[in-house]
Design a protein with these regions (language model features):
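PP2C/PPM-type serine/threonine phosphatase catalytic domain
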Residues: 1-364
Length: 364
């Protein structure tokens, strides 16, 4: 896919749009940073103090882009939590996430997290990721509450998200040299100690037991490099050194020829934490062992702090991309035989000549 022009990278002051747990399991959302003041000149520039903020969010006096609600977000509900940050190089946050909790018909609890990464070289990637995260989360909750098995619910939720992103192509005028709105997706459900993961694209899921001894990646990227390695056409070093390495071969969007959700279900053999994230995090610690060294030891009991730490880790190492991470603690270990994946599943049957789409602007 042709790459677009790079955006204007403006650093904005930190903004925190957050939801935190209250006693009884509810959440209280912090107000939109602009919602408590009238629209117009009463808004004050965080850089120069002028009260001249235009409708696009820029200061007419110094030109500084003002913080937006999506620049930094944190949410936590019944243990499952997520943190998203714009990073230091992009002018907006094109990642999105959702976290939720519900009950199954038998009374058992279930927690859900969805993370999506908008394709920067497509039209309105921020809207694509938000639409996918919201629609997938809603579909998962509805299915789980109706008694649908998590793996089936996951597949259906990803397809629901795909359809919603498809619809955006008709809602926006496509920008020149850009594809229709598009994004990746990764999602996880934890219920009664059992984990189900689903994904399309290169957003990832990892499993970290409390002792970190069996840490592993649960997903396989839908990417050009992955396909070359799995086909035996290139070594891993050769494939990932190629300029086409990070071109994704699976995504949600009207330009995707076919959406094929991948799913994985397993029962952990020990308490631990499921982590799902965009490449804004894993680009700085790709291997499970490397990422395990960064995940705080108390991630299962303090997941929000752990998510904050991981987002900060990515930003401290350059923040070249938006970064989003969600954590789902797994406290309960079933007494029956655990089922643990030995390695990430392979994409058996996927065509090696599938179309690709560039994730970020400037890639070729």
């Amino acid at each position: 896919m042709p790459s677009g022009a790079t955006g204007d990278f403006v650093l904005a002051a930190p903004v925190l749009a957050t939801e935190v747990e209250e006693p009884g399991g509810g959440t209280a959302g912090a107000p939109d940073p602009w919602s408590s003041v009238p629209v117009g000149d009463s808004r004050v520039c965080v850089g120069c103090g002028a009260q001249r903020i235009d409708t696009d969010g820029y200061c007419e006096a110094c030109g500084l882009a003002q913080p937006r609600p999506r620049d930094h977000q944190e949410r936590s509900l019944n243990g499952v939590c997520g943190v998203s940050d714009r990073g230091h190089r992009h002018h907006r946050n094109e990642d999105a996430f959702a976290v939720a909790a519900t009950s199954r018909p038998d009374g058992s609890s279930a927690v859900v997290a969805v993370v999506c990464d908008g394709v920067s070289s497509a039209t309105r990637p921020d809207d694509a990721s938000q639409a996918a995260a919201d629609s997938a989360s809603e579909a998962l909750l509805e299915a789980l509450e109706s008694g649908v098995e998590p793996e089936t619910a996951m597949t259906e939720a990803i397809m629901t998200a795909a359809n919603r992103v498809d619809e955006l192509a008709d809602e926006y005028e496509r920008e020149p040299s850009r594809n229709a709105p598009a994004c990746t997706i990764v999602s996880a459900v934890v219920t009664e100690g059992r984990v189900t993961v689903g994904w399309v694209g290169d957003s990832r899921a990892y499993w970290f037991p409390d002792d970190r001894s069996g840490s592993r990646r649960l997903t396989v990227d839908d990417s050009w490099a992955t396909r070359m390695v799995e086909a035996g056409l290139m070594s891993e070093a050769e494939a990932f050194a190629d300029p086409r390495a990070h071109a994704i071969t699976g995504w949600l969007g009207a330009d995707a020829i076919e959406v094929e959700p991948h799913t994985l279900t397993f029962t952990p053999d020990a308490p631990g934490t499921v982590l799902i994230c965009t490449d804004g995090l894993w680009n700085y610690a790709e291997a499970a062992a490397d990422l395990a060294a960064v995940v705080p030891a108390d991630a299962r009991t303090k997941p929000l702090h752990a998510a904050q730490t991981l987002a900060r880790y990515a930003c401290d190492r350059g923040g070249h991309d938006n970064v989003t991470v969600a954590l789902l603690p797994v406290d309960r270990v079933e007494p029956h035989e655990p089922t643990m994946p030995n390695h990430p599943p392979t994409l058996v049957g996927d065509s090696l000549d599938s179309p690709t789409i560039q994730l970020r602007e400037g890639e070729s």
